[in-house]
């Protein structure tokens, strides 16, 4: 006989009379006693992660939202009086704060912010919200960090109310008054609204619809808490970077609840992984059949919209206008998530068989052990305020870079870690704020090739051009906002990242290397033949000037740390405010990784052997020929940029190593930094280094910035480069992989 079950705050579960979802349930089985015990164990496992808020804190949130709601009502009455509405209308004019997102779903964590929507009647304008209501908030003692973002895609007021972060959207309905029992799911409310109000309403409408489409809200909430924690721990929780955001995870869990309406959380977590590890993407996930609504708004429909047919992992919002919440998902991010679903299924299989504990599901795999090759992106700005804006823009475009990388014929997977990290300062004496992202790469196996040359120049350059162009067009760009990119091997990451994120890594021979502050003299990226690419600011490089093709920065020629062999030189990513023509090649280890597994691999900790290391000094080019301006700058013939070269042995490769030597040195040998004068130098010409010094280059850059700081804010959003172009620098990140 099935055991009745009561979960936290829920009533006894009975077989549902109502049909949920677009298909019949897979199973109507009621929970067993073992399921109840596993669910209780799941709750106990979740508690230390802070996914449950204390009752006292929850009451505090309710109190704050009550104060905010009263402020809205008071403000709307004042607006109504100022617009001479009849007293009878003013007394019942209403106005209300609605919540959405994780708080409305009931799955918010400790310290999480609140997403809120201010709903006002038709006589209250958006301009009133961003003026008089903003001023009213400013007068409140509890309100701190008040800021308005009126020009955003979804305009918002952000604030901290008595220690709780709140984002408030605004929607004006075509109603004379706002009743207390207003149901925002009513499609007729969307009539005669402007698009910004429709967007603002969408969050509440979707959240409310989800809660009405699950059989048991308490079981849904506990399952969603577990899945969200799992996704965050496994670094696949980020809509902006091409993974899934909170609403998408909620819809996947809701669909699981529909398919197993009587199951409780322990079963639902397992069924979640079962369903979506076997889901035949790109078949869409739908919580209900889309309903026709004659409001002429664009909806997700691949039968009508050709672009919708290219969505890889569609999860469709249940409220009109239906949208795909996962349009950012790429081939790589879907591959990573599906692999994580499969691993989640394997672990929950073990848990249900009492072969593992729930804690195993929430163990964080070490991203920095999964791959042999990484691209590190660095964004820097001179002030903290500028850094926040710059980092936001760069992060929003990283998925474009991932999409470009995965189209490279030699790349199987480009996996960006959603976590960003503070980057070590380039110059400890200079005020600079730097943020770093890491992208793991898996290269395809190729047969009949000892060495594979992979050129990532075009992919990186297209990305940086896009970011700079948007920054200038949106009038956000400031001098000294920079992006740098470099290729790094797994064993070098300890020189860039905090030690706590690399704790699963074997100890390196790094005596004498200090992680913080980390300047160029303590960062040696050459021991594994890595290449770097540095992209200058778009306001620089307006005139012909000496080039520093090595891309090095102050401190480059200072003594290397103890970890490096004496014969190995530094090659690293820096931001150089001058146009460059830089092509680099390197030989690395084999790259036959499969899709990342949860299990970590031991890091290679052997220092490079000087006997097998071959050093070719970087060449700096003095007095280059003048570069054409305008669009011509982007059309300079360059045999490297954009060419997807086939694999071919390098003619001057060092003798083939034995298997033992290969294991120890394949990631350590042959440092090449090729730079060119019209790309015509031979290898023999590269064995010299000119006398141009970095200090001279920096002085030249400084003088150029001072004299060439011209307004770029009138750029139109067109593909062609403006007259004073964002420099399309033919820098190069090229890898030569030993087979």
Swiss-Prot record:
Cofactor note: Binds 2 magnesium ions. Also active with manganese.
Domain of life of the native organism: Eukaryota
Motif mapping: Nuclear localization signal 2: 644-659
Binding site for Mg(2+) 1: 113, 115
Record organism: Bos taurus (Bovine)
Record carries keyword Nucleotide-binding: yes
GO biological process entries: co-transcriptional mRNA 3'-end processing, cleavage and polyadenylation pathway; cytosolic mRNA polyadenylation
Protein name, per record: Poly(A) polymerase alpha
Annotated effect of mutating residue 186 to H: Small decrease in non-specific and specific polyadenylation activity
Chain sites annotated for binding Mg(2+) 2: 113, 115, 167
A GO-annotated cellular component: nucleus
Organism classification: Eukaryota, Metazoa, Chordata, Craniata, Vertebrata
GO function term, MF aspect, one: poly(A) RNA polymerase activity
Similarity comment: Belongs to the poly(A) polymerase family.
Effect the entry attributes to changing residue 459 to A: No change in non-specific polyadenylation activity
Gene3D superfamilies: 1.10.1410.10, Beta Polymerase, domain 2, Poly(A) polymerase predicted RNA binding domain
Outcome of substituting residue 247 to A/R: Strongly reduced affinity for RNA
Catalytic activity as recorded in UniProt: RNA(n) + ATP = RNA(n)-3'-adenine ribonucleotide + diphosphate
Record-listed E.C. numbers: 2.7.7.19
Name of the encoding gene: PAPOLA
């Amino acid at each position: 006989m099935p055991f009745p079950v009561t979960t936290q705050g829920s009533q006894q579960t009975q077989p549902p009379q109502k049909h949920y979802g677009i298909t019949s349930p897979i199973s109507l089985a009621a929970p067993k006693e073992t399921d109840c015990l596993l669910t209780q164990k799941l709750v106990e496992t979740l508690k230390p992660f802070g996914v449950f808020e204390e009752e006292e804190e929850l009451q505090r949130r309710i109190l704050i939202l009550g104060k905010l709601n009263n402020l809205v009502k008071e403000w709307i009455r004042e607006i109504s009086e100022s617009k001479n509405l009849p007293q009878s209308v003013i007394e019942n004019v209403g106005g209300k704060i609605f919540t959405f997102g994780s708080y409305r779903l009931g799955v918010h964590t400790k310290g999480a912010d609140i997403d809120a929507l201010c709903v006002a009647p038709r006589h209250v304008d958006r301009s009133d919200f961003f003026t008089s209501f903003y001023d009213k908030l400013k007068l409140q003692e509890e309100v701190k960090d008040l800021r308005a973002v009126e020009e955003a895609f979804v305009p918002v007021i952000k604030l901290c109310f008595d220690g709780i972060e709140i984002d408030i959207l605004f929607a004006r309905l075509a109603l004379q008054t706002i009743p207390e029992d207003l149901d925002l799911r009513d499609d007729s409310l969307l009539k005669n609204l402007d698009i910004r109000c429709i967007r603002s309403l969408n969050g509440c409408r979707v959240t409310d619809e989800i809660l009405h489409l699950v059989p048991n809200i308490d079981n849904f909430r506990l399952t969603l808490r577990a899945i969200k924690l799992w996704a965050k721990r496994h670094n696949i929780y980020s809509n902006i970077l091409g993974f899934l955001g909170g609403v998408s995870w909620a819809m996947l869990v809701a669909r699981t609840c529909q398919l197993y309406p009587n199951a409780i959380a322990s079963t639902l977590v397992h069924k979640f992984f079962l369903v979506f590890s076997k889901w035949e993407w790109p078949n869409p996930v739908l919580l209900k059949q889309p309903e026709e609504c004659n409001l002429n708004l664009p909806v997700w429909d691949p039968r009508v919209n050709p672009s919708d047919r290219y969505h890889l992992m569609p999860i469709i919002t249940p409220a009109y206008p239906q949208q795909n919440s996962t349009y950012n998902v790429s081939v790589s991010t879907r591959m990573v998530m599906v692999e994580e679903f499969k691993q989640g299924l394997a672990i929950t299989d073990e848990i249900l068989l009492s072969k593992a504990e729930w804690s195993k599901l929430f163990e964080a795999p070490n991203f920095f052990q999964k791959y042999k090759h990484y691209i590190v992106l660095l964004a820097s700005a001179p002030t903290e305020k500028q850094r926040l804006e710059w980092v936001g823009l760069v992060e929003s475009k990283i998925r474009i870079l991932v999409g470009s990388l995965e189209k490279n014929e030699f790349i199987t997977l480009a996996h960006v870690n959603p976590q960003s990290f503070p980057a070590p300062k380039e110059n400890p004496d200079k005020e600079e704020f730097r943020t770093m992202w890491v992208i793991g790469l898996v290269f395809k196996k190729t047969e009949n090739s000892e060495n594979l040359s992979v050129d990532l120049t075009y992919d990186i350059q297209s990305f940086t051009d896009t970011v700079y162009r948007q920054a200038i067009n949106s009038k956000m760009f400031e001098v000294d906002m920079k992006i740098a990119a470099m290729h790094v091997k797994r064993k070098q990451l300890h020189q860039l990242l905090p030690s706590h994120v690399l704790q699963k890594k074997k100890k390196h021979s790094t005596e004498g290397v200090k992680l913080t502050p980390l300047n160029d003299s303590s960062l040696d990226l050459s021991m594994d033949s890595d290449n770097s690419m540095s992209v200058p600011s778009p306001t620089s490089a307006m005139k012909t000037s000496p080039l520093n093709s090595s891309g090095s920065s102050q401190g480059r020629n200072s003594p290397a740390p103890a970890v490096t062999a004496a014969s190995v030189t530094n090659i690293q990513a820096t931001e150089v405010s001058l146009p460059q023509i830089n092509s680099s090649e390197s030989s690395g280890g084999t790259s036959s990784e499969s899709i990342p597994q949860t299990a970590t691999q031991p890091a290679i900790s052997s220092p490079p052997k000087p006997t097998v290391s071959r050093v070719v000094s970087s060449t700096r080019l003095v007095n280059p020929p003048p570069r054409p301006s305008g669009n011509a700058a982007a059309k300079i013939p360059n045999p490297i940029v954009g060419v997807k070269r086939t694999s071919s042995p390098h003619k001057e490769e060092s003798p083939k190593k034995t298997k033992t030597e290969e294991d120890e040195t394949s990631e350590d040998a042959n440092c090449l930094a090729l730079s060119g004068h019209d790309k015509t130098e031979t290898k023999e010409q590269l064995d010299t280094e000119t006398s141009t010094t970095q200090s001279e280059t920096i002085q030249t850059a400084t003088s150029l910035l001072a004299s060439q700081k011209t307004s770029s804010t009138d750029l139109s959003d067109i593909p062609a480069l403006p007259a004073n172009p964002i420099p399309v620098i033919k820098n190069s990140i090229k890898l030569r992989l030993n087979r």
